[in-house]
UniProtKB/Swiss-Prot annotation:
GO terms for biological process: defense response to virus; magnesium ion transport. Acts as a Mg(2+) transporter. Can also transport other divalent cations such as Fe(2+), Sr(2+), Ba(2+), Mn(2+) and Co(2+) but to a much less extent than Mg(2+). This is Probable magnesium transporter NIPA6. GO terms for cellular component: early endosome; endoplasmic reticulum; plasma membrane.
Amino acid sequence: METDNGKGLILAVASSVFIGSSFILKKKGLKRAGAIGTRAGYGGYTYLLEPLWWAGMVTMIVGEAANFVAYIYAPAVLVTPLGALSIIISAVLAHFLLKEKLKKMGVLGCVSCIVGSVVIVIHAPKEQTPNSVEEIWNLATQPAFLIYVAITMSIVLALILHFEPLCGQTNILVYIGICSLMGALTVMSIKAIGIAIKLTMEGVSQIGYPQTWLFVMVAVTCVVTQLIYLNKALDTFNAAIVSPVYYVMFTTLTIVASAIMFKDWSGQDAASVASELCGFITVLTGTMILHGTREEEQQQASSEHVRWYDSRKSMNEEHLVSLYSPEY
């Protein structure tokens, strides 16, 4: 493996450990905050006063910082799929700390994620680093990528303005869709900023270029939007479901965006590209197994208690509406 790819690999793995842990810390913080004030899923910001939520935020920031540097050294097609490791971390911790059980099929899902990640690492392409932020800007303003951005923003606006009020509290794809679409743009801008910082540290200053600051503005806007809707998703839905669904959507969209903007697969033979895709599909399969395991458990709980299952989360556990409740 190339030296730069090796550095990116180590940083990506470390990032996954921190980010996976942060999901659990933030989840526990959100549950505590929801018990004393308006929940984040309903527009509340009580969690900002909860120390445990801030501990999760700090952990996530450390993980994202490691991820940020990883994108400087390695292509998105290598770094992004390794985020599956954070799902394993969060699933295991959720099993012990949130009492969200991880059964045999869940373990199989974790193993699939690891196997797929290894295949991707072995066949990852070596990235050609741009020589200036202007060169990155030229990549970002090519017609194909501009069309991608236009489609992305149209979908995000539709989700926020139309679908969130309509079904945001019952359909996980609304909140996660917004996070993932904005997340793909975040990665592209963060990668541009990282390369600009690297070039500046090597003596080729990129600070004076207006394109550098445009990328910073895009990154800040996208990150803030991601955080708002990720908090809503975590507060409304089960953490063991949010993590894999977010990963699948975010990773897929990021790889698509990177392939369009940076042409990651240019120069690779068909066998290597096919191997990477197979590895990616294996990882996706693992995350879907984890997701399916959680859904099966929830349906069983609903059946055992003769209740209707509501996909939303209460302040304590899954929100179940009993047929025999005196309220109904």
